[in-house]
Amino acid sequence: MKLKYTNKINKIRTFALSLVFVGILIMYVGIFFKEHPVIMVIAMILGFLAVIASTVVYFFIGLLSTRAVPVICPSCEKQTKVLGRVDACMHCDQPLTMDRSLEGKEFDEAYNSPASKKSQT
């Protein structure tokens, strides 16, 4: 079974979107506790904090996205952004690398860790 690799930017955006939905769900659950104001307020505050956390994550990924290197994917020929030494295409999940020493090797996200970079040299 082959693992499906996805783009790092898309992973973080998906996490931020899930934080929005989780926050709204927590606030919605808080409505069911109208008779218990303390529980309702705690649920509303936790939900609000989850939505605020998603805003922070979206801001962070926006900053990262501006630093990512735009490349043209050789498979789908669409522009995508590469974060780190290895990443996947945003459109077709094709493994991509910016490091010539990794060309032709099996795709592994561990190549982005500093320990892996030291062991390669």
Swiss-Prot record:
Belongs to the UPF0295 family. It is a multi-pass membrane protein. Keywords: Cell membrane, Membrane, Transmembrane, Transmembrane helix. The chain crosses the membrane at residues 14-34, 41-61. It is found in: Cell membrane. This is UPF0295 protein ABC1323. The keyword Transmembrane applies. GO terms for cellular component: plasma membrane. Its main location: membrane. InterPro entries: UPF0295 (IPR020912).
